[in-house]
A protein has these predicted regions:
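Asp-based, Mg2+/Mn2+-dependent phosphohydrolase catalytic module
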Residues: 2, 10-16, 37-45, 154, ...
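Active-site neighborhood of HAD-like aspartate-dependent phosphohydrolases
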Residues: 38-89
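A metal-dependent, Asp-based hydrolase signature
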Residues: 74-75, 81-134
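N-terminal export signals
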Residues: 9-29
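Conserved SAM-binding loop
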Residues: 56, 165, 219-220
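Substrate-recognition element of Asp-dependent hydrolases with the DxDx(T/V) motif
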Residues: 131-179, 187-190
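N-terminal secretory signal peptides
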Residues: 1-7, 30
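Boundary at the C-terminal end of the N-terminal hydrophobic targeting segment
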Residues: 32-36
């Protein structure tokens, strides 16, 4: 057998072997390349915007902690969590006055301060001086994030623009961002839109601020109602499970509706988005 023929036989054997391995799935370079080049989930989404209170921030324990810090040294002994719950319960009615048009827009810091006055007599703190009340109002600026937020946000920020689409005002959002090292690219939502969710302008002005169409923006929240409102306007939607966010028996472990991405927590949510 001459050398040329031997060379052809060896090459043919090598190709047959490679083909057999490829068929077995043990060696498939073209398949590996195709998998590596697979499109990421939600390729048209450029920005993630977030509900904050409850989704990103543990408002209940944070408010209770800060109120206790201020008042306990003054001799008060309240049910701190009940105080936080009562204060938060005034949140919706206060915003509804503005959403309904009965009142011009004011930012959330002002509503929180007014709502504090509404519950003072219930907890027998009517005699507190204004500087103490102002300090209590800053409890909302000193909230901590849930434990899954930091690591997951670091992953998400590698791919997406990120901002709050929150009812919180800019100063409040800036303070909690600095406290928790949140990687916001902007602070959007209520104050720039001069309204409160679920008013359509809050979602749409947030998209416009990034020069993006609604379908290029994903609203991320632990509250299905918030997501449904955004979805109706064309935003993509992501649900993050947050059972117990407002105490035992509260919060959503699962969404109440059909949304684009559903995560058990922010780690799972980042996984689903391929980051």
């Amino acid at each position: 057998m001459n050398s040329t023929r031997r060379s052809l036989i060896r090459r043919g054997a090598a190709l047959v072997a490679a083909g057999a391995l490829a068929g077995s799935g043990l060696f498939a370079p073209s398949r590996v390349r195709a998998q590596g080049a697979a499109r990421l989930p939600m390729p048209d989404v450029k920005a993630l915007v977030f509900d904050t209170f409850g989704t990103v921030l543990d408002w209940r324990n944070g408010v209770a902690r800060e109120v206790e810090r201020v008042l306990k040294s003054m001799g008060y002994d309240l049910d701190w969590l009940a105080f936080a719950d009562a204060w938060r319960k005034e949140y919706g009615p206060g915003m509804e006055e503005i959403r309904s048009g009965r009142r011009p827009f004011v930012k959330l810091d002002i509503l929180h301060r007014e709502n504090l006055d509404r519950i003072r007599s219930r907890f027998k703190i009517e005699k507190l001086a204004e500087p103490t009340l102002a300090e209590l109002n800053l409890a909302w600026h000193k909230l901590d994030v849930w434990p899954d937020v930091g690591p997951a946000f670091a992953r998400l920020h590698k791919r997406f623009l990120m901002a709050p689409c929150s009812n919180g005002n800019i100063a409040l959002m800036a303070d909690v961002a600095r406290r928790n090292n949140l990687p916001w690219d902007a602070i959007l939502g209520s104050e720039i839109a001069q309204g409160y969710k679920p008013q359509p302008k809050v979602y749409l002005v947030t998209c416009e601020a990034f020069n993006l169409k609604p379908e290029q923006v994903m609203m991320c929240a632990a509250h299905s109602g918030d997501l449904a409102s955004a979805q109706q306007l064309g935003l993509r939607t992501g649900h993050i499970g947050r059972p117990g966010e407002g105490g035992p028996g509260t919060g959503e472990a699962e969404p109440k509706g059909s949304f684009d991405v559903v995560g058990k927590n922010f780690h799972d949510f980042a996984d689903k988005l391929g980051v």
